[in-house]
Curated annotation (Swiss-Prot):
The gene is rpsO. Signal peptide: none annotated. One of the primary rRNA binding proteins, it binds directly to 16S rRNA where it helps nucleate assembly of the platform of the 30S subunit by binding and bridging several RNA helices of the 16S rRNA. Forms an intersubunit bridge (bridge B4) with the 23S rRNA of the 50S subunit in the ribosome. This is Small ribosomal subunit protein uS15. SUPFAM superfamilies: S15/NS1 RNA-binding domain. NCBIfam families: S15_bact (TIGR00952). It holds the Pfam family Ribosomal_S15. Transmembrane segments: none annotated.
Amino acid sequence: MSLTQARKQEIFEAYQIHPTDTGSADVQVAVLSERISRLSQHLQQNKKDFASRTGLLRLIGQRKRLLAYILKQDRDRYKALIERLGIRG
């Protein structure tokens, strides 16, 4: 369920704003989206894993707050990010 260091590095390189960026809101949202995707797959196979379901809801809330922050800062960057990640219909 957790991300490997190599996969995190791929996400950092794909979404970073500058070469040493690992903590911007865009990168954090991308990492959270990957974790949410993996956890959703786990929960489809393990329907009674309620602890993981709680963790999933926590991750979704965190991503929602970060996306609200990005929207408040720069609407164009927000639209580009959600389109690139394939979230929000």
